[in-house]
Regions:
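Alpha-helical transmembrane segments and immediately membrane-proximal extracytoplasmic
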Residues: 1-424
Length: 424
């Protein structure tokens, strides 16, 4: 009796294994995103609301930021320069053909600590490293997963970003516009189908956990539908220019703060960043944290700000974000950059058109798209990221602004410097 399996049956079995494992990766990614955001929400509530309500310690913000920064510095000195951002993680996957997964708990702790003390960074850094690390662990320990490890790692990273930002297509475009190749041997249609399976699983797990135990980070709020007037289209060039100025400022300060941070020894640099963060937060609390909750507040109270104050906040937010990233209070830059773009858009629109809601929303959308385009060089990714944040009718204008921004800003920030942290 011939026990040889037909090529068709083997192919079907491999395809089913691929689909099932991608669904599992998506589910794990969704669960990890929820866990990170829930711990962050509980920790932030304790440190910044419950504890201050029980004590009346002077200079509380400075104390928490400096003490937390010192802990982060010591942690990084012992365990290494974590967390790593998406670009660094995927670059290691491309060049080294693997990603080290032995430090996943360290990555999670390193991602959480800066967020808890109010660092001006987002939560995405660290998540992708954990997901990709899990995929390579599976490749090393599960026979059927070995040949598709790189595919799994890219899909896992894409799903985690999409679930985190509540933007279904953002993750796949972020990974695709980053990678030099497609998802290995997969065809375009198959790739999107597999990503859809993983995303459905990830979103389902995240939504289920949020419904059962409460959500963590709520994500950026959505702007209401507004009427776009002829004046807004005429002002598009000005808004794009403002976004380009912010993008250039972000890249220049990224390089400057990186060069300055190299002159500081380990731990001292983190303490310095914590001191700057604490002093800034004592006078301008809106500059602390990643910016998603602050943006929700800003949407309701922007008329209480002077336009020039909002413009100044945009520049200070980018400067503080780069200071935190380069001096060791590391995290992602997407949330703070979006907040800065919205502040600049609001400020410019209010200067020219007054506080009318339609004008300021359009200004915020175009400035933010141009800013992100200039920093990321990925107009499709920018469009997918902002798609659920701004009204659908602005979709084409957001893409145009992001495309212009990605072409006109040529200053490229240097690779983020790493301090000489000794691993003991």
């Amino acid at each position: 009796m011939n026990n040889t399996k037909s090529p068709k049956n083997v192919s079907l079995k491999n395809q089913l294994e691929l689909w099932l494992f991608c669904a599992l990766i998506g589910a794990v990614a969704g669960a990890l995103v929820w866990i990170l955001l829930k711990i962050m929400a509980v920790g932030t509530e304790f440190l910044w609301k419950w504890l201050p309500g029980k004590t009346s310690f002077p200079y509380y913000t400075i104390l928490i930021c400096v003490a937390g920064a010192a802990i982060i510095g010591i942690f990084r000195k012992i365990f290494g320069d974590y967390p790593e951002d998406l670009e660094t993680v995927m670059e290691k996957v491309r060049t080294e053909k693997r990603y080290e997964y032995k430090n996943m708990l360290v990555m999670m702790v390193a991602a959480l600590l800066p967020l808890l003390i109010g660092s001006s960074v987002g939560p995405e850094a660290g998540l992708t490293g954990i997901i990709v690390g899990l995929c390579y662990w599976a490749g090393d320990n599960l026979k059927f997963a070995k040949q598709n490890t790189r595919n799994y790692s890219q899909i896992g990273a894409a799903v985690s970003m999409s679930v985190l930002f509540h933007a279904p297509l953002f993750g796949i475009f972020e990974v695709e516009e980053t990678s030099e190749e497609d998802l290995a041997a997969l065809t375009k249609g198959s790739k999107l189908f597999i990503y859809g399976i993983a995303l459905a699983a990830g979103t389902g797990i995240y939504a289920s956990l949020s419904a059962l135990f409460g959500a963590g980070l709520s994500g950026f709020p959505s702007f209401d539908m507004v009427e776009i007037q002829r004046k807004d289209y005429l002002l598009m060039i000005l808004y794009i220019l403002c976004g380009l100025i912010l993008a250039y400022f972000y890249q220049a300060t990224h390089k400057l703060t990186g060069n300055i941070s190299n002159k500081f020894p380990a731990v001292v640099k983190e303490i310095f960043a914590g001191l700057c963060l604490g002093i800034t937060g004592s006078f301008l609390p809106v500059l602390m944290f990643s910016g998603e909750e602050q943006m929700g507040t800003l949407m309701k109270t922007y008329t209480s700000y002077l336009p020039l104050a909002l413009i100044a906040i945009a520049f200070f937010k980018l400067l503080l974000t780069n200071l935190c990233i380069q001096f060791g209070l590391k995290g992602g830059h997407f949330f703070p950059v979006i907040f800065a773009g919205v502040c600049m858009g609001y400020g410019m629109a209010m200067l020219i058109c007054g506080p009318d809601g339609g004008h300021v929303v359009f200004g915020a959308a175009i400035v933010t798209a141009s800013l992100l385009g200039g920093i990321m060089k990925k107009p499709l990714t920018v469009t997918m990221l902002l798609f659920l944040c701004f009204p659908v009718k602005m979709f084409i204008w957001i893409f145009i602004a992001a495309a212009v921004g990605s072409k006109l800003i040529t200053l490229k920030p240097e690779q983020e410097p790493s301090a000489n942290y000794s691993k003991q």
